[in-house]
Amino acid sequence: DKLAMKANTRQLNGIGAFCDDMRDALRGPFSDDHKGGFLAGMPDMEESLKFGIVGAISHPQIDMTRVNYSKEAWTNSPTQMVSYVSCHDDLCLTDRLRSSIPGITEDELIRLDLLAQTAVLTSQGVPFILCGEEMLRDKKGVHNSFKSPDSINHLDWNNLKRYPQVFNYYSGLIALRKSHPAFRLANADLVRKHLSFLDAPKGVVAFSLNDNAGGDSWRDIIVILNANKQPTDINVPEGEYTV
């Protein structure tokens, strides 16, 4: 109980932790680069992803017995959780997708990359993005590049020209989050009050932010994360929506 570790974050006012529950739910476990997660269509990842979406707080719609690593909430506030899918340690996102999904096409890689960061940037908590992922960075499959040369760690700025759609999508996600306080609610009570999950099939996580959450100009917001290769149908509350 005296260690400053993730499990004890609730005792550390003003200090947060990276959410490996969410990271590994999205891309697969740290222990096996070739095993995928939600993005690869692996089953039973939804509850762990939902836990990350609420900022690792307690929430009545989350079954903690089905969360991958944590069996109880480990934050008092969503601001104590860092939401992310990759960082300087381990494989970067594009390398992990290639490693865990054999034969993945470039189109699939881009779509799943964007899906992952949509989850990160629409979740409660503090989003974190590895430098260069906004232009589909890779590190040639090197698992931990701290001792690798510049040929592995450098940023290939030509990727901005190769993948402008990726850069523009990331920019749009950041602008969306900055413009809408519903995605960055200040405390756990507000998250429990305004964020609810919708019924969804396997491979899909859907949630709504209701009643001008956080003073948002949008009354209701619906986010649907579909990792399946086929379209899906989700019943949403009656109303007029802009897609």
Label each PLM-derived region with a short phrase.
Residues D1-C131, M135-L136, F146, N210-D216, ...:
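Conserved alpha/beta catalytic core and glycan-binding cleft of carbohydrate-active enzymes
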Residues D107-I110, A119-M135, K139-V243:
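Carbohydrate-interacting/catalytic domains
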